Amino acid sequence: MDNAAIASQSNTPPSNGRSSARFVTPISVHSSPITAEVIEPSSPFSPPSPSTLLTSLSKSPSHKISNLQMDGAKTTCLEVLQNSSLVVDSPKRQDKSITGSKAKPASTMRHGQRTASHKMATQTEIQTVDGDRLIVSPKTRKKKAATAKRTRKQDGVAERRLHGHVSKVKSPGDLKLDAKIPPSKPCDNKAPSVGDNTDNELERQTGGLQLEKATKRRLDWTPTKEGPIPMVDLAEVHSSSCGKSVIRTHSAGTLLSNYGFSGVVNTSLAPMPETCDNGPTTKRLMELQNFYSASGIQTPTESRPATNDSQSISSKQQRVKVKKPQKAKLTTLTSYVTAKYSVVDQTADLDRIETVNSGKNKKMGVTKRTSGTERANAARGKSDTLKNGNGPPVFKVVPPLEAFKSFDGQELLFGTSSQLEHGHSEDQDEEIQHTADSINKSNVVPRPAVSKGLGSSLFRLSSSKNLWSASSRDLTGAVLQVDEIDLSERSIEVSTPAAKYKRKTGIRDLSGQNVIDVEKDTRTLAANIDTRELDNMNEPSLAEDDLVYRENLESTNAKLNSQTPANISEAMLERPLPDKPIFGGFTTSELAKQVAAYGFKPIKSRDKMISLLEKCWENQSKSSKLEPKPNQRNHKSQGDDLAERQLLGLKPRSDSISFVNTRSPKKRLAKTSVKSQESKSFSLSNEGPRITSKLPMKRFVSPCAILIDDDQSSDSVGEALPLSPSHSSNGNGTLHHPQDCDEIHAPTTQMAIRSAKSSISVSSTTNLPSLSSQITKAVQSQPRIRAFKGLKQPTWYEKILMYDPIQLEDLAAWLNTGGFGLIGEDREVGAGVVREWCESKGICCVWKKQASAKSH
C-alpha cells in the first residue's frame, strides 16, 4: 500500500458529505506494532523513531496514546482510493463508538465479519481533523481487545458519572458510588473521554488490592461533623480550580485527628458552620431554660421569639411561672423538716395557709357567680383583705354542693400521725385552727357536748415541739397539750377492780340489814364508797372524780376518829379470828417470815418452826375470848360496820354475811354438828330481821358461827391487806393487831372450807369461778417440797408433767386440806370432780385399791 495514495485520499471529501467530521478508520497493516508512519508535505516517506513516540505518550495530558501529527492537508493517497469501500464504512463505525448507537447496517456487518480476526492482527488508526492533518497511531491486539471492552463498559459508567456528578448535596447512595470510583474534577463541562477513565480503571485493576486506600475509606465511617456537602476526598484531592470550591474537604489525617466527642452534637444539615461549631446542645438549652425560669423545657422556637410581641408575651409567661415554686405545696415530711433550715424566703413557712386561703377565695368567687348575693360580695372583699394579710381569715357557709367539692381541694400530707408536727408560730396555729373550724362548719358536723365536760384547757393548741404532742388531737383536729391531760383516772377505776373482784369471788355489798338487801344490790361499789360516791361517779370530769375519791377517804377516817376507844376495842374483840392455818403447807421461806413476825430468831428445823407457830397462834387466839352482848351490836349501822372492816383491812363478801365474835380451838365442833348448824343457818337466812332475835350470838341475820373469819382469811393471800398503815394507826387498835395482819396471809383452815360450802347464797353461785379452773390454779400454785432423807418429793404439778398416775382420793384430799387454801378457794371437791378434771386435761388418774372411809 502506498503512503502517497493515503495522503491524497485524505484530502478527497467523502461521499457522504462529512468533510469536516472527525472519524477514525482502522486499517490492517502487515507491519510491526510499533511502526508508525507520519506523513508530512516536506518529507512524506520519513517515519518517526520509537523514542519520539514514547516521549509524546508520556507528555500527553489526557493519558492517550500519542498520535503523530503531520502537516499538509493536501497530501494525496492513491492506495486509499483503491480501498474506498473500507474508507466509506469507517465513519459509521466511528459514529457507533461515539454515540453508542446500536444500529448496524449491512456494510457494518460485513466490516465486522471482515475484521473478526483483527484480535490477532495489528491495527492502525487514522484520524482526520478538519482536513488539515492526519494522525496515525499503531494499535496492538491487546489494546484492541481492551478498547472493545472499555467502549461497552465506559458507556454505562459515563452515563452514571454524568447523572450523579452535580453541584448539590449528595445522597448516601452517591457517596458509596464515589467511594468505589474516585471522582475526577474537570474544569470544563464536557463529558469525560472514554480513554481516560478506562485507562485509570485498568491501572486500578492491575494495581492489586490497594490496602492503604481501603483503610482510608474505612475512616469515612466515623460520625464526624457534617457540612453542607458531606463529601470526603480520601485521595487528598482538594477543590477544583473551576470556581466551585468544596466547603468540607478532609484528608485522612484530619479525620483521624478530629475523631472523638467534643461535647457538641450537630443535628442540622443547613450550610451554617457557625451553628454547627458554636451552637449549644439540646441539654444545654434545657439547663439554661430551667435556670432562668421554672417552666418546662421549651423548644428552640419558643426560646427565640421572632417579634417584640412574642417577646413580651413570653416574658409575662416566665414571670408567672417563676412565682410557682414559691407557692409549691409541702406534701412530704422531708419538705417540712428541711424548710426550717433552708435559706429560702420567709413565705415558705406560710405555704399551707396561703394555699388554704387561695382555695377559699376561689370558692367564694364561685359562690358569688352562682348566687350573686351581697354576702358573696362581702366574702370576696374579706378574702381580698386576707390576701394582704390585714386580718384573720373569715369563712362563710357555702352551699352543700360546694362544701362537698371542697374535699377535692384538701391537701394530703404523707407521714405517720406521730410525725405530723407543724413548725408554725402561734399566730399561724390560730389561723389553722380557724380554718379547721370553718371546714367543720361547712360540713355541718356538730361538735359533741362531751368535749365541754373534758375541760376547755385541754383543747388549747399545743406549743410543744415533741412528737407525742403532735400525735394527740381533739375532735376538731387541733393538737392537744399532752401535759395538761390527767391520765390517772383514779376515780373511774375505783369501781373497776371491785367489780372484777365481785365476779371472781362473789363479793356483795352490805347495803341493808338482811341478806335479801345484799342480794338485790349487786351493782354497788366497794365497801369504801357510800351512796354519795355513787352520785359523783356519774360525773365525767376527771378532777371531780379525784376529789370524790379523796372525800370518801376523809369521811371514812372521820367516822373512825369519831368512835370512842371502847367501841374500837369492842370492835376488835368482836372481829372473828381465823381458824388455825396449816403451817405444814407453807414453804420454808414463808415459815421463816412467820417466825420473824413473832419476834423469834431464825430456826433451821422446819418442824420446830411449825410447832412454834402453832403455839403462837393458840396463845394469840386465847387473848380474844370475850363475847359482847348481842343487843349492843344490833343497833349499829352499816356504815360503822364498813368502817370497822376497813380499819382491819378486810373486804366484805356476799357469802360471809355474819361475823363471829370470838373463836378458839376449843370451840371447834365435830364436822357433822357444824354442817347441821350451818344448814339451819342457811335455811333461816331468808327470813329477814326475824333471825336476830332467834340467834342472839350473831350480828345481823346469818346464824353461821364460823363464816366470816374463814372467808376473809381465805381471801388473805395478798388481797385482804389493810389499805395503808395510817388507817390502822388512826383506829388506835389493840397491840395484837399487827399480829392479826400477819396471820391474814396464812392459808385457810378446814373449818373455813367446810363453812364456805354451805354459806354460799343462790345469787353468788353464778359468779363463782368453775372448780376445774380452781383446781388447775391450786395445782400450779403448790410450792416445791424439800427433799426428805435424800428423796425428792415432787409436787402434784411435777407428777402430772412426769406422767405419773394421779390417785384421785389423794389429790382431792390435798385440795380440800391445803390446795384450795393457796388460792383462796372455800369450796370442797370430791374424787369424782377431780376425776372429771383429770380426764378433761388428759391426766393419767387411778383410784385407790382400798377406798377410804373418811368423807372429805
UniProtKB/Swiss-Prot annotation:
Localization: Nucleus
Principal subcellular localisation of the protein: nucleus
Example GO molecular function: 5'-flap endonuclease activity
Comp. bias regions, Low complexity: 51-60
The entry's keywords: DNA damage, DNA recombination, DNA repair, Nucleus, Phosphoprotein
Pfam families, per database record: Slx4
GO biological processes: DNA recombination; DNA repair; DNA replication
Basic residues bias: start-end ranges: 139-152
Secretion signal span: none
Assembly notes: Forms a heterodimer with SLX1.
Protein name listed in UniProt: Structure-specific endonuclease subunit SLX4
Higher taxonomy: Eukaryota, Fungi, Dikarya, Ascomycota, Pezizomycotina
